[in-house]
Amino acid sequence: MTKKILIITDNLVDQINGVVTTYKNIEPYAARDGYSIDYINPGRYRYVDCPKYNEVKLAYPKDLDKTIQEIHPDHIHIATEGFLGLFARRYLTIHRINYNTAYHTKFPEAIKKLFGVPETFTWPMIRWFHSNSNAVLTTTKSMVEELKSHGFGNNIVTWTRGVDREIFKPTERKVNEKLVLLNVGRVSKEKNLEQFYKMNYPNCQKIQVGDGPMLKEYIKRYPDVNFVGTKCSAELAHYYQQADVFVFPSRWDTFGLVMIEAMACGTPVAAYPVQGPIDVIDNDITGVMDANLSTAIKKALDLDRENVYNKSIKWSWERAWEIFRGNLRSSK
């Protein structure tokens, strides 16, 4: 008999980000092992974009209790700390129903960057949100330690990520007249992209793949950057494959799925030595971390692309599914 997993998320299923990508990529393995995945997301309700952070949708789920009862899931997972997550937490706690949660995004840091709200205010809220979860799944060992340092319990689990190797793989590359420096992701303030755009690196072409709330502003502000919009599947892989270095300037990501997509294509990564990169990059093998991004790029150019690819093989969506499945608890 097929077992039902219910995932409650404040992201729409067609959004392009690391959270949505993660759940989409474990679905085939869930189906293989006799599980089906249902979603409660803002698409079921009327919603508005969160100001300054339109990745998060604000929906009022007036019939969420009824929806959960109708789905009658065997397991429940709350993916995000938004409105839907809050309403689900309330219902599940009142009825003493088991569930687990995920910590995907460094919200305290992002909220401080976007709205100026002190982290001393948001960390207690995040800790409270996850306090009744049977297991808190987060991206890396360093994130586990950070959550513990903010008062989380011992039920935190490292939930690794993967990459679709049918799409993201090395290919024959053309010789670029200029160095191609690439970033892929949400075009927004908290991604720290201006450190990449402002960088005065010689004889290079900077390419930005992705959309976001700051896209129009950055197009005006940085005419030398080639903004190409959202790309998916083979078209996205082509940008990774043809880039000389993937530049990851973010200081607030818990992981950075785009880094391992780049590595799977053989493209080395240049990044700051912060959470996310320190857990993903094998320094001086798959990329270079340095407090000076230009220095990181210069050193990354000397790395062997075959070694970059070979080291990336450890990232597997099947392994990600196994960890997710192993931390499910019965909701009945």
Question: Language-model segments: which ranges?
Answer:
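Short alpha-helical donor nucleotide-sugar binding micro-motif in glycosyltransferases
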Residues: 130, 230-231, 238-243, 324
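Nucleotide-activated donor-binding/catalytic signature segment of Leloir-type glycosyltransferases, i.e.
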Residues: 216-234
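Donor nucleotide-sugar binding/catalytic pocket of nucleotide-sugar-dependent glycosyltransferases
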Residues: 124-170
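Nucleotide-sugar donor phosphate/pyrophosphate-binding loop at the beta->alpha transition
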Residues: 98-100, 109-128, 165
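Conserved donor-binding/catalytic core segment of Leloir-type glycosyltransferases
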Residues: 8, 174-207
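A charged, aromatic-enriched C-terminal amphipathic alpha-helix characteristic of glycosyltransferases
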Residues: 302-331
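Aromatic "clamp/platform" in nucleotide-sugar-dependent glycosyltransferases that forms part
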Residues: 251
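Short hydrophobic beta-strand element within catalytic cores of glycosyltransferases
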Residues: 259, 268-271
